[in-house]
Regions:
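Conserved thiamine diphosphate
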Residues: 1-18, 166
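Thiamine diphosphate
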Residues: 17-182
Length: 182
């Protein structure tokens, strides 16, 4: 499970606690984006994401904390933004709908690109027979210099500016290179 803010973290922790089986919650170091805390702790349906913004051509699939940067970047391109919430199981119905209605899907996660959530999305797209263009944004398989969280996100192309660069490259038809940063 990959919460995008403090409220979702609380609800996903509740979801994991009530789930009859193993559960893991990904969350970044430091503080959250500052979401106001709602009083309820209702669990979320396992394996269900949520569309946070409707757009055209490009869909940004945010796993966890990068949701805020994805929403900011989406404004410049009228992109759809999905809060995926779950790495396993993936929301296959939402993925199918996004693959049918968009030219490009870009996964965004604060995790390793190789073997991460984006890889799981690409495996599912291939197995389901979707030929949509896909890109993965995440932490490349190389040393990331020490720094504050914002600087490290920028280094990996996981800030709003980096996401915008990736969208622009994808729309221009530039080929993706595994592990590249925006």
């Amino acid at each position: 499970m990959a919460p995008s803010d403090e409220n979702e973290c609380r609800r996903l922790l509740t979801t994991g606690f009530l789930h009859n089986g193993p559960a893991a919650v990904r969350y970044p170091r430091g503080s959250g984006p500052g979401a106001s805390i709602s009083p309820g702790l209702e669990p979320l349906p396992i394996g269900r994401g949520m569309i946070r913004r409707r757009g055209r051509r490009v869909a940004l699939l945010a796993f966890g904390a990068p949701l805020a940067a994805a929403l900011e970047a989406a404004e410049a391109f009228d992109a759809t933004v999905a809060d995926m919430r779950f790495v396993k199981p993936l929301d296959e119905a939402m993925l199918a709908e996004l693959a049918r209605t968009h030219e490009i899907l870009i996964t965004i996660e604060e995790n390793a690109i190789a073997g991460g959530a984006g890889s799981a999305v690409n495996e599912w797209l291939a197995a389901a027979g979707f030929g949509v263009r896909a890109r993965q944004l995440g932490i490349p398989d190389r040393f990331i210099p020490h720094g504050d969280r914002g600087a490290q996100l920028a280094e990996c192309g996981l800030d709003a500016a980096g996401i915008r660069r990736t969208i622009l490259r994808a729309l221009s038809g530039e080929k993706a290179v595994l592990g590249e940063t925006a």
